């Protein structure tokens, strides 16, 4: 075979290798994911026509708490987005999932490595009369390239699983955000309820104090007995204890809100408001509609799909890894000759 024929052979082989790689890439192993279904009757005796799922309820808004019309609650909810540590952790986990997905996707592309080395050696003389050989320098540069052919779909399945984990992490972030806002709203309304309770208990304490004073005056005048005074004192002590319990409960809710907004409880305070609790208009809905607002359900379903994709990656690991690789290198005794 002449020299020109040998040079032409690689150019003819490369298209064939590329075509074979594309054909073999379709041999992805592992089961295809099928979303789980739940057996349901054809009709329910309590309901008539079916309603298609359409989660367009205003209550699903990202700022659902504004329906209560409370400016203090709105300001606290805005601080949750900035300072809540649970949200920061969920966001970091989402960024981690994105980075891992990018790393899995990088396996589609070839990898390149470069090496460099330098040695200096000297050979001792074999006889006493012979002089020592001068030291010899050696410089080398090398490069390697490799590309794994995804014959069995291992890389494809890993990328699919990583992308599904990103979707699950995104749903986890939405669940963490919903949980933080809902917990803050619950604690805030409990605090406002404690304010109202404390207001009525303080009024009751003032009334019992007046009643005790009147009873003591009646006792001094000989109109009431000692038992009436003792009963009035007992009622006053009970009212004061209830008022103290309401104050302690309010402090606990205030401290919980401080933690949710990322502040130290010692330096955080919410002014008491003697006003009725706001009531939002809650739309009439179905339990199935409420499930559409559950991001944790979406996260669980995405993890099932990711586990299904991981089955294919595990099955592909049983087969040999096929790839293409090439390497080249140079060695010179003079560094200037190597880099020019």
Model-derived features: positions:
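A small-residue-enriched
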Residues: 27-48, 78-150, 182, 250-268, ...
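DHp/HisKA histidine-phosphotransfer helix
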Residues: 86, 158, 197, 228, ...
């Amino acid at each position: 075979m002449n020299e020109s024929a040998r040079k032409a052979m690689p150019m003819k082989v490369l298209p064939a290798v590329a075509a074979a790689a594309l054909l073999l890439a379709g041999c992805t192993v592992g089961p295809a994911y099928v979303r789980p279904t739940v057996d349901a009757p054809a009709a329910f005796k309590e309901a008539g026509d079916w309603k298609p799922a359409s989660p367009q309820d205003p209550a699903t808004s990202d700022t659902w708490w504004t329906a209560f019309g409370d400016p203090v609650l709105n300001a606290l909810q805005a601080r949750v987005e900035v300072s809540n540590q649970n949200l920061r952790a969920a966001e970091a986990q989402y960024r981690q999932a994105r980075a891992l997905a990018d790393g899995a996707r990088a396996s589609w592309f070839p990898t390149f490595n470069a090496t460099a080395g330098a040695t200096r050696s000297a050979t001792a003389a074999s006889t006493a009369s012979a002089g020592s050989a001068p030291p010899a320098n050696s410089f080398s540069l090398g490069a390697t390239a490799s590309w794994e052919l995804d014959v069995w779909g291992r890389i494809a399945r890993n990328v699919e699983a990583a992308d599904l984990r990103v979707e699950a992490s995104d749903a986890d972030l939405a669940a963490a955000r919903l949980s933080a806002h809902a917990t803050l709203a619950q604690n805030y309304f409990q605090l406002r309820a404690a304010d109202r309770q404390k207001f009525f208990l303080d009024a009751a304490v003032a009334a019992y104090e007046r009643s005790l004073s009147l009873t003591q005056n009646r006792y001094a005048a000989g109109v009431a007995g000692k038992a009436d005074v003792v009963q009035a004192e007992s009622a006053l002590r009970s009212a004061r204890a209830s008022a103290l319990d309401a104050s302690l409960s309010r402090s606990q809710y205030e401290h919980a809100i401080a933690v949710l907004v990322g502040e130290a409880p010692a330096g955080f305070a919410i002014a008491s408001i003697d006003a009725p609790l706001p009531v939002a208009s809650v739309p009439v809905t179905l339990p199935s509609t409420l499930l559409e607002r559950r991001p944790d359900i979406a996260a669980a379903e995405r993890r099932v799909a990711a586990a299904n994709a991981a089955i294919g990656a595990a099955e592909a690991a049983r087969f040999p890894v096929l790839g293409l690789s090439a390497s080249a290198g140079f060695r010179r005794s003079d560094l200037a000759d190597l880099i020019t």
